[in-house]
Amino acid sequence: DLHSFPTRRSSDLHSHRGSIDFNTKEAKVTLDEQGRPIDIIVRRRTRATSLIEEAMLLANECVAQLLSDAGIETAYRVHERPAPDELKDALRILRELGLVEGSLAGALVTGSSAAIQEVLEDAAGTPAELFVNTVLLRAQRRAIYLPHNDGHYALGARAYCHFTSPIRRYADLLVHRALKAQLDGNADSREQREIGRSLAQLCRSCSERERVSDGAARDSQRVKIAEDYGDRKSVV
């Protein structure tokens, strides 16, 4: 049943694997033909987008697990546990506002993904929801690409990669090549050995370019939001 798939998948991730589901707001700026902002809306998660997202995550995880089980090096997407100092800072802020206390606070500072998810669920639907999500999200490490599998903390996944996504990354292509070679019985081909020799550098480059492109996207959006605000202010 496709309609219940996202709910069943999400329930399995939270209850059995301890995944974390951050609920943040993402703005989308609509531009006219001249590149001027004409509208700003908040992207909302719908049943359709949840279905696509969960299917994509499952495909990525299945491919990563297959390659990892076969001992294949590729561009794995790795997310490490949060740094203790970052969690302590987040806990201090949430405690001062009376949002976390007792044993839950102790579990959160150890990096328990279940505790983080519980704090997020407690804040859901309250005025503090967006703030709590932001504080805990900023305490997380940034996910990176590595040539070896080391799991994905936030997803609770033993292995993860970018195999399919709305945008085609170079990391996706590295995974496609590795998967095709494995399925064709050519995992030890000359081409794959050549890729393997430079894989660590390729992963570092993919991680760095992602940081740069994400920063450029945020800066561009801020500029357009400021332009839109300026236009509205001049009209008033």
PLM features: residue spans?
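Electropositive polyanion-binding surfaces
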Residues: S4-V236
